[in-house]
Amino acid sequence: MGKEKTHVNVVVIGHVDSGKSTTTGHLIYKCGGIDKRTIEKFEKEAAELGKGSFKYAWVLDKLKAERERVITIDIALWKFETPKYYVTVIDAPGHRDFIKNMITGTSQADCAILIIAGGTGEFEAGISKDGQTREHALLAFTLGVRQLIVAINKMDSVNWSEDRYNEIVKETSNFIKKVGFNPKAVPFVPISGWNGDNMIEATTNASWYKGWHKETKEGKATGKTLLEAIDAVDPPTRPSDKPLRLPLQDVYKIGGIGTVPVGRVETGVIKPGMVVTFAPAGVTTEVKSVEMHHEQLPEGLPGDNVGFNVKNVSVKEIRRGNVAGDSKNDPPKGCDSFTAQVIIFNHPGQISAGYSPVLDCHTAHIACRFDELIEKIDRRSGKKVEDSPKFVKAGDAAIVRMIPSKPMCVETFTEYPPLGRFAVRDMRQTVAVGVIKSVEKSDKGAGKVTKAAQKAAKK
């Protein structure tokens, strides 16, 4: 096996008919974690149903059904390998809560793959009328995704026309530049997801195609296929050197063991013997043990979903949405208010001070009041366009001071990204997204410090 490969997370975006499912399905099918038995089973069913040509998208539909049926997602279904990386597709697009998932999502995407339909008329529809592609690209950029790959799909439907390809590259470059990406750093790859052309092996249908190239701070890279473009992603840095932040997903009471909070380590490291503080609950105690998949761990690192056993704390004292951190190293605190850059997506009316929607930030789900609209800004450059606007509407971006209706723990986006981005939910949809610029933390003295914590401190 040799050295473990680095893990990278990609998110696939694009218009609803761009062929995202087919393309994603193809990569997973050819390079992925689906075992051969499952594939044979699907192929047999496909043949019986007269879907004999076996469309990759159909595999993906089957996987989606499995994924929705099985509560513990078999994430192998959403992984594939490149020579350098293990790649996880964070969200199968087309998902209703795509936007919310990208924000509160299990992980920060390291790279976005934008799939563009190259068919006559399709490209134009995807980019112009339907704002969805733009919205998703803007969202990825706002949430700190700086690496992008553009796959120009359905090239078979335009006979691999060089003119058509160049036209789309030009238009798409303008489009992504408006969003904030640098086109020089973006590989453009012509593909046919349906036929699997130029996805894994270089196409033989386009003698004119000399390959893609990109230039980033890390240097230059070139290649032919989509797989090579994914393999050329700059390796992500994982924040294990930062102080611990672990938002709780659940808290269990387990007979014979006691209280076991569960969650994903976002930054830092959690170890047995560490004294942790839960915010905003204000409870401090010692970590007895850390485990993942029913195995004891010497430490939990960023990205690990862990359960940890804590002493002298009842299930009633801590809950989902609380954040655990190291009591000796920038411990987390609750906040009285925070200031954020908010982009309004799809709200039918005008939003003014006093608006109180629900915020989803990491695992917390709490109503917050838009207390003051400080300024309206240009959503690309971040420059101020208006002081103290009376209201904001869909398409606007603003700096807003927000007050949570009950104690919550958030951080600035620059220091702790997963705790500094949020979705604004109202009318059963995501109406806005935000990144937190500053936090007014509440200094409500130390809360409960357990005997175990005091003992551990003396060691």
Swiss-Prot record:
Region G1: start-end pairs: 14-21
Segments of this protein annotated with the region G2: 70-74
Region of interest (G3), residue spans: 91-94
Described purpose of this protein according to its UniProt entry: This protein promotes the GTP-dependent binding of aminoacyl-tRNA to the A-site of ribosomes during protein biosynthesis.
Binding annotation for GTP: 14-21, 91-95, 153-156
Cellular component GO terms held in the UniProt record: cytoplasm
Residues bearing the modification N6-methyllysine: K3, K30, K316, K390
Membrane-crossing segments per the record: none
Keywords from the UniProt entry: Cytoplasm, Elongation factor, GTP-binding, Methylation, Nucleotide-binding, Protein biosynthesis
Residues bearing PTM N,N,N-trimethylglycine: G2
Keyword Nucleotide-binding (UniProt): yes
Residue ranges, annotated region (G5): 192-194
HAMAP family: EF_Tu_A (MF_00118_A)
InterPro entries xrefs: EFTu-like_2, GTP-eEF1A_C, P-loop_NTPase, T_Tr_GTP-bd_dom, TRAFAC_GTPase_members, Transl_B-barrel_sf, Transl_elong_EF1A/Init_IF2_C, Transl_elong_EF1A_euk/arc
Protein name: Elongation factor 1-alpha
Ranges for domain tr-type G: 5-240
Organism: Blastobotrys adeninivorans (Yeast)
N6,N6-dimethyllysine modifications at: K3, K316
Pfam families: GTP-eEF1A_C, GTP_EFTU, GTP_EFTU_D2
Modification type N6,N6,N6-trimethyllysine: residues: K79
PANTHER family: TRANSLATION FACTOR (PTHR23115)
Family stated for the protein in its record: Belongs to the TRAFAC class translation factor GTPase superfamily. Classic translation factor GTPase family. EF-Tu/EF-1A subfamily.
